[in-house]
Curated annotation (Swiss-Prot):
Residues 36-55 bind DNA. Residues 8-76 form the HTH gntR-type domain. It comes from the Bacteria. Repressor for the uxuRBA operon. Keywords: DNA-binding, Repressor, Transcription, Transcription regulation. Coiled coil: none annotated. GO terms for biological process: DNA-templated transcription. It comes from Escherichia coli (strain K12). NCBIfam families: PRK10225.1. This is Uxu operon transcriptional regulator. Transmembrane segments: none annotated.
Length: 257
């Protein structure tokens, strides 16, 4: 496998392998592919990379991922190019790669913000949480998540470092415009995860109010770890009870070392 900095990312290489498997076997439209776990073993890669490759193939219309039912072939013509889901380099990363970058960036932003935040900054964070609560209470499917974005942005702005704010804005924009993230996010039930993540946000805010930099860093890290695990759970196509432990993560004690 090539490195993530080569012309192709790992999930793109694996996507091409799965496409070749569909063509050469061959699997006809409507037929079910082997389970994600078997594909990972067959190609000697992690299930996370296979999962991202399947999302890419789903975007391109080659397969359909049915949660709890399996992976089904839609097109076996081989006419689709799997090099990239989008020509824009900002959209070229897989969703879990984006999450890992956010985890590294935003945990350190939260740590610094705990030392820099003013009273006005805390007020902005509280207002963002209130907006989140109103959006959650509306219970409308696909309702706005602007409160979520405003909360994370308020933390970045509390560093009073314009470069950190810009880095945050860019990472969020990449997420919003990333077709693989959008595809994965579409499999989620908003009401289930947004309530959990609102609770995470309250823990982060509590640490920031106390100016506890270590607690703020760890709370943000754990929040994005929870996001990652929820996405892994909901993106699994073999077992609806999969708990997401196959994605490598750093323990909290390593983060704070």
């Amino acid at each position: 496998m090539k490195s993530a900095t080569s012309a192709q990312r790992p999930y793109q290489e694996v996507g091409a392998m799965i496409r070749d498997l569909i063509i050469k076997t061959p699997y006809n439209p409507g037929e079910r592919l082997p389970p994600e776990r078997e594909i990972a073993e067959m190609l000697d890669v992690t299930r996370t990379v296979v999962r991202e490759a399947l999302i890419m193939l789903e975007i391109k219309g080659l397969v359909e991922v049915r949660r709890g039912a399996g992976i089904y072939v839609l097109d076996n013509s081989g006419s689709q190019n799997t090099d990239s889901p989008d020509a824009n380099v900002c959209n070229d990363a897989g969703p879990f790669e984006l999450l890992q970058a956010r985890q590294l960036l935003e945990s350190n932003i939260a740590e610094f913000a705990a030392l820099q935040a003013t009273r006005e900054d805390i007020v902005k964070m509280r207002q963002a949480l209130q907006l989140e609560e109103r959006e959650l209470a509306s219970s409308a499917p696909g309702s706005s998540e602007s409160g979520d974005m405003q909360f994370h942005l308020a933390i970045a702005e509390a560093t009073h470092n314009s470069m950190l704010v810009e880095l945050f804005r860019q990472s969020w924009q990449w997420r919003e415009n990333n077709p693989m993230w959008i595809q994965l996010h579409s499999h989620l039930d908003d009401s289930l995860y947004r309530k959990e993540w609102l609770g995470d946000h309250k823990q982060i805010l509590a640490a920031l109010i106390k100016k506890d930099a270590r607690a703020a860093k760890l709370a943000m890290w754990q929040h994005l770890e929870n996001v990652k695990q929820r996405l892994l759970e909901f993106s699994n196509v073999d077992d609806i009870y999969f708990d997401g432990y196959l994605f490598d993560s750093w323990p909290l004690d390593k983060v704070d070392a």
